[in-house]
Amino acid sequence: MPKYTLYYFNSRGRAEICRMLFAAANIPYNDVRIDYSEWDIYRSKMPGSCLPVLEINDSIQIPQTMAIARYLARQFGFYGKHHLDMARVDFICDSFYDIFNDYMRMYHDQKGRVMFELMSQMREWYAARNENSGYEECYMQPSMAPSAQMSQEVDNSDTLADCSEMRSQDSMVEPPSQKLSPELESQSSLCSERPQCGPPDPMMGSDFERLSFNEGRMLEMRRRYDETCRRVLPFLEGTLKQRYGGDRYFMGEYMTMCDLMCYCALENPLLDNAYLLHPYPKLRGLRDRVSRNQRINSYFTLRNYTDF
């Protein structure tokens, strides 16, 4: 058996899908968790200066979350039984990753750095804006959900094409800028300037000034994340219903990587907004089934609890 070493920070983050695959397959590995203060020591040793990285037999290094996850899924039997199944697993995983990636963007500064030091404060800031705006649910748009009555063969090809087109457009074109209300415009100045309405915001202090962040960018990242949820979640709910009415797994009778993605990609978004999956009962049921899997449940019991 190969020797596996997974490098990531001491958080769930982008590496959790890989850890869940190891757990589901009951395969041992070395889980190296790098403290944020030590990252500069490791940076030059990692391909692309990024994490996570999977190291195999102390020699081969594989970067990029989904490349690692797909490799492990193929090795461990969680990637479908033939090419169309694998394509289905791919577009479902990539759709969940769209949500997860836009969620992570909300906690990055303008230079692409994750703001670990301010993460708790930022979550409180977003939660306060949720309450003020009445944002509780991500409503389903029925026209975006694929029909469960369509044949599986047609569903596979059509939904794959639709998803590919969406992802291509997303990667090439930035979403159109949305004009803010006068109140929000007054909050989009640099963080060194306090908003003129309401009490002083605890987020607007020296930390934000040092990290060159501002409320306008936070609002834009939140808007992008919300739009991705409204686009992707109804599509995934409908895709799940295509097999066994959505009462088992995305591939039908057996669990694959995309079912694990349904759990880990939405774990933090659901901590921020417990209503996120309220309109999507099949996705909620799937997450329950994944968490009840004996190996996954054992992993959850033993894993290090982290806030992010």
From Swiss-Prot:
Residues 165-205 are annotated as: Disordered. Residues 178-191 have a biased composition (Polar residues). GO terms for molecular function: glutathione transferase activity; structural constituent of eye lens. PANTHER family: GLUTATHIONE S-TRANSFERASE. Belongs to the GST superfamily. S-crystallins are structural components of squids and octopi eye lens. Contains relatively little if any GST activity. This is S-crystallin SL18.
